[in-house]
Amino acid sequence: MRKTAVVAAGGTGGHLFPAQALAEALIARGWRIVLASDERVAGLAQDFPAERRIGLSAATYRPGDPVGMMRAGFAVLRGAMHARAAFREIGPDVVVGFGGYPSAPALVAAILDRRPTVIHEQNAVMGRTNRILAPHVRTVACAFPTLKKAPPKVAGRAVVVGNPVRPPIRALADVPYVPPEPNGPVRLLVTGGSQGARLLSELVPEAVKALPEDLRRRLTVHQQTRPESMNTARRAYRDALVDAEIAPFFRDIAGRLREAHLVVGRAGAGTVCEFAIAGKPSILVPLAIALDDDQGQNARLLADAGGAEVARENQLTVDTMANALEKLLTNPARLQRMAEAARSVAIPDAAERLADVVEQTARGR
């Protein structure tokens, strides 16, 4: 008889993409997948391989807002009651939470029903939902070797598995890095993430304009930008005489990552792990408003290994970005060293490792 896993994930790509990678790994092992989340997930989960989806009420709150906390608590309880009713019909063998407040109702229901439970934390800093629920679940898995803000007993038993990534990204682990020739073409990829892309959309094109002419003539840029920034970015690259592809979203991000000599991006957990797996040198710009500076802590994985430079928003200008780009793009030997350092901390088989943990938990081990 096929086993069933309920995968509960928040409605952003940072939570959903690793959840999907796990789902695909479990399906390959014969499991049936049920996705539990709120209505926000619909736009991102069109390709999620779930046989069934459960929409659950959930809400978040701002720290220091007791009324908001009460409302969020009632919403989670309503969602948990709905989940318990669904679980009686589905009979899941395990419930796996990936963080974000929409994951809470399914996990609360599983905890109340004493069902096997797993939490996966994508960031180097444990998120608020996972932090609250982790002491009550059977198994905690994490992506990074350090897990800040976790209760001490939780951090001590967390299993490091890495961040599950989509198969096209996983395939890049076997592709060697080839640095640019001294006078040859140079390819720069600029990613944005779901939050805070405006800064990179506007600053990087201006920084490229400030590069020496001989470097600009060899440069090709692929950049994700917000729709409202596309015309400004195109104009800047056109003025700089730089060949550039500008789009809000690249469906074949793996292909562009494969060809890039250097990547500039935020430091979301998935982004950092993807750069490591692909073995790409990077300039990381942690989102300044990220809760608990989780992006800054994520960036340390690559920076401490020597695979990335970190540029803090409060110190970032057109000139500092231009200087960082020039120093790296004109130094192939350093790019090669950074690529090797980035790949040294990668865990490309994270989806399989997490699937092993899920199966062990379901068996009661």
Curated annotation (Swiss-Prot):
Pathway in which this enzyme or protein is active: Cell wall biogenesis; peptidoglycan biosynthesis
Mode of membrane association: Peripheral membrane protein
GO molecular function: UDP-N-acetyl-D-glucosamine:N-acetylmuramoyl-L-alanyl-D-glutamyl-meso-2,6-diaminopimelyl-D-alanyl-D-alanine-diphosphoundecaprenol 4-beta-N-acetylglucosaminlytransferase activity; undecaprenyldiphospho-muramoylpentapeptide beta-N-acetylglucosaminyltransferase activity
Keywords: Cell cycle, Cell division, Cell inner membrane, Cell membrane, Cell shape, Cell wall biogenesis/degradation, Glycosyltransferase, Membrane, Peptidoglycan synthesis, Transferase
Pfam families: Glyco_tran_28_C, Glyco_transf_28
Gene Ontology cellular-component terms listed: plasma membrane
Annotated protein name in UniProt: UDP-N-acetylglucosamine--N-acetylmuramyl-(pentapeptide) pyrophosphoryl-undecaprenol N-acetylglucosamine transferase
Species this chain originates from: Phenylobacterium zucineum (strain HLK1)
